[in-house]
C-alpha cells in the first residue's frame, strides 16, 4: 500500500523520483525501491515524507484513508475522571489519581 501512496503523492506534487530522493537525502535507487515495494522506507524517512506532503505517516502506510495529519487533542481532566485508567497494566485507583489531579490543578492554577 505504501508504494502506491508514495507514487500518488509524489506525482500530485509534480516531483520526479530524483527530485524527491534529493529532498529527503537518499539515492534515487533507494527511493525507487520504496515505490517498487522492494525496499521498506525507515521510520525517519516516512516522517520526512509525511511532513513534506503534509499527510500522516498512517496515511502513507495505508492505515487510514484520511491524509490529514491532525493530532486528536484530548482533555486530560476528562480522561482522569474515567473509572478505568491503567498505567503500564496497573489499575490506577482513586487513591493514586487524587494526588495527580491535585498536582495538575496547582500547576495549571499557577500558570493562569
From Swiss-Prot:
One of its GO terms (biological process) is regulation of DNA-templated transcription. The keyword Lipid metabolism does not apply. CDD domains: HTH_XRE. Pfam families: HTH_3. Keywords: DNA-binding, Transcription, Transcription regulation. It comes from the Bacteria. SUPFAM superfamilies: lambda repressor-like DNA-binding domains. Residues 17-36 bind DNA. InterPro entries: Cro/C1-type_HTH, Lambda_DNA-bd_dom_sf. One of its GO terms (molecular function) is DNA-binding transcription factor activity. Residues 6-60 form the HTH cro/C1-type domain. This is Uncharacterized HTH-type transcriptional regulator YobD. It comes from Bacillus subtilis (strain 168).
Amino acid at each position: 500500500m505504501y508504494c502506491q501512496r508514495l507514487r500518488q503523492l509524489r506525482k500530485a506534487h509534480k516531483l520526479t523520483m530524483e527530485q524527491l530522493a534529493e529532498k529527503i537525502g537518499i539515492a534515487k535507487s533507494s527511493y525507487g525501491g520504496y515505490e517498487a515495494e522492494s525496499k521498506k522506507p525507515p521510520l525517519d524517512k516516512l516522517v520526512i515524507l509525511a511532513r513534506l506532503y503534509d499527510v500522516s505517516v498512517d496515511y502513507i502506510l495505508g492505515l487510514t484513508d484520511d491524509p490529514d495529519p491532525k493530532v486528536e487533542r484530548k482533555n486530560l481532566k476528562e480522561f482522569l475522571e474515567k473509572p478505568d485508567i491503567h498505567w503500564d497494566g496497573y489499575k490506577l485507583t482513586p487513591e493514586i489519581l487524587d494526588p495527580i489531579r491535585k498536582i495538575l490543578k496547582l500547576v495549571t492554577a499557577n500558570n493562569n
